[in-house]
From Swiss-Prot:
BP GO annotations: 7-methylguanosine mRNA capping; methylation
EC number: 2.1.1.-
Domain of life: Viruses
UniProt name for this protein: Probable methyltransferase EP424R
Length: 424
């Protein structure tokens, strides 16, 4: 029987009553002491990647069962209603906001607070948060630092993609950018004529180098670097990892160029099966004393989202390493950054994470979601009634495990909107 979400037959809907809370998943990866040899276009024996390719195929087959429902607006709407109903953390965001005086309580806020509470970082008092708007990570770090760590101050800088068109809105839903402009590194398109114009796009090598420089000029040392970037892939979830390769490389490179020795890193990823992703994790393993692949409980188990966490940075880039990696971003190709055959033990640990997070937990919950759809697509209210007791258990357990305390008014972030709470 599964350690994650499970169900069985019995009474007509007894399988709903047996849903159990997920655990925070944390898989450690071994540090690599041998020299790092970066390559412009590394080759990898196909046999090394076989099981990762099989994992990708297996997960995509399960994801594809939902594809026909996405083709019709009516069935797509019903599917999202069902998936929303089985979100065990729906409603928790407002509870956290009102009970603990929290700000910008989004799903991102819950995930970051959980990561901070679980990973035991040595210092989070100075942070660079990339791909950040609307600001859930910054708000969670601020809340944690003042209520759990009791730092006298929290210093931060941040960046996000600034839309190229004046008609596109910056995702500053809470006014965190508007009210704290000096903390932000990206610039409006109106400033394009400036020599150091930077719109925050981390797929551009010159932007990455400039963001890292600006961050370290404004804030030294940087104890924590976070990046929560992800491209909207529409309904094409089977290519989610592939379509995000360059973005995830750029946000990681920005962090490695700016994070101080002894610092910690949190990076969003999705599945971990592509050769380039595997090679990027191999690169990380040379720079951090501890490296983990994680899945917070508040990260929806039906999605592929993962967070790579590095603790205690041991060394900075050499000039040659910086040059090679920036050049790869500028002239991007998705071949591995290193010879993967040199990292067999690390790849075994990564594959264990793939099995645990995606082949077990995600597939099981996707199947659970489809079963709920078949039984309740026209009975959403009934589904909510059945799951209400379980949701309370999940949410109460989360609050106990994550040690929430009230944020004093004097420590709140400055926001420029009357709506400073959560997104339901």
């Amino acid at each position: 029987m599964s350690n994650y979400y499970y169900y069985y037959g019995g009474g007509r809907y007894d399988w709903l009553k047996t849903v159990e809370p997920t655990n925070f998943l944390k898989i450690g990866l071994p540090y690599q002491a041998h020299p790092l040899h970066l390559q412009h276009q590394a080759t990898t024996p196909p046999s090394i990647l076989e099981k990762f390719k099989r994992a990708d195929i297996l997960l995509n087959e399960v994801k594809s069962e939902m594809d026909p429902l996405m083709l019709q607006p009516e069935t797509e709407k019903k599917l999202y209603q069902v998936l929303g109903s089985i979100d065990m953390f729906k409603g928790l965001r407002k509870k956290v906001e009102y009970t603990y005086n929290a700000q910008i309580v989004t799903n991102a806020w819950l995930k970051m607070y959980e990561l901070l509470n679980t990973m035991n970082f040595n210092n989070t008092s100075q942070a660079f948060c990339n791909c950040e708007l609307p600001g859930g990570f910054i708000s969670a770090i601020n809340h944690f630092n003042h209520t759990m760590m009791h730092y006298p101050t929290f210093n931060w800088v941040a960046s996000s993609l600034y839309p190229s068109s004046e008609t596109d809105a910056l995702e500053d839903h809470y006014g965190l950018y508007q009210c704290n402009p000096d903390n932000w590194l990206m610039q409006s398109p109106l400033l394009k004529k400036n020599m150091d114009y930077n719109n925050g796009d981390v797929t551009i090598a010159s932007n990455v180098k400039n963001l890292a420089l600006k961050a370290t000029q404004k804030l030294t040392p940087i104890h924590l670097y976070t990046a929560d970037g992800g491209i909207n892939v529409g309904h094409d979830y089977n290519k989610q990892e592939e379509l995000n390769l360059k973005l995830h490389f750029g946000q990681a490179l920005t962090g490695l160029l700016s994070l101080s020795k002894g610092g910690n890193m949190i990076l969003k990823h999705y599945t971990l099966n592509h050769a380039f992703t595997l090679s990027l994790i191999c690169v990380f393993s040379h720079f951090f004393e501890e490296l983990y692949i994680t899945k917070p409980t508040s990260s929806r188990p039906s999605n592929s989202e993962t967070y790579i966490v590095g603790k205690n940075r041991l060394r900075l880039f050499t000039p040659k390493e910086e040059q090679v990696l920036l050049k790869r971003l500028e002239f991007f190709n998705d071949t591995p950054l290193v010879d993967l055959s040199l990292y067999q033990n690390l790849l075994e640990s990564i594959y264990f994470a793939v099995e645990t997070i995606h082949l077990k937990q995600q597939i099981e919950f996707l199947n659970f979601g489809m079963k709920c759809y078949r039984h309740f697509y026209n009975k959403i209210k009934l589904l909510n009634e059945y799951l209400a007791p379980k949701k309370k258990i999940f949410q109460d357990r989360w609050r106990v495990l994550n040690k929430l305390y009230v944020l004093e008014k004097k420590h709140k972030l400055k926001l420029c909107t009357s709506f400073q709470g959560s997104v339901a």
